[in-house]
Regions:
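Sequence/structural signature of long amphipathic alpha-helices
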Residues: 1-120
């Protein structure tokens, strides 16, 4: 029997990342926030390029050699597409975290410059 709250989204990597971010983001240091804000866009770009290349290659494989047996089982194509969908969802979540991290880092820096505490 599941004791998971009905208010939580379906569990997947993107939703898990966003939930953890919402819980932890306000407690991170400027360095940690900058790490997310500066590192995530590069990773998102790299992974998006990788997904584009993989899906293009799969399209070519399927269209050029229908008799190769590649993705010939009933659920092969849907499994690949679901995997790609989950990867793209994670990239979207990571982009959201990076954007928010940049905003929070800037907010903390401005508060520090004014001699106060961010969020106070």
């Amino acid at each position: 029997m599941s004791t998971t709250s009905k208010k939580l989204a379906v569990f997947d990597a993107a939703n898990a990342m966003l939930l953890l971010w919402r819980r932890a983001g306000d407690h991170m240091t400027e360095d940690e926030l900058d790490w997310f804000a500066e590192g995530a866009p590069d990773l998102v770009q790299l992974q998006a390029d990788y997904i584009a290349n993989i899906t293009q290659g799969l399209g070519c494989l399927i269209s050029n050699d229908a008799s190769s047996g590649a993705l010939s089982e009933r659920y092969d194509v849907s499994t690949v597409l679901w995997n790609v969908s989950h990867q793209v969802g994670v990239l979207g979540a990571l982009t959201s975290v990076a954007r928010d991290a940049g905003f929070l880092a800037q907010h903390k820096k401005q508060a520090k410059a004014k001699g106060g505490r961010a969020g106070a």
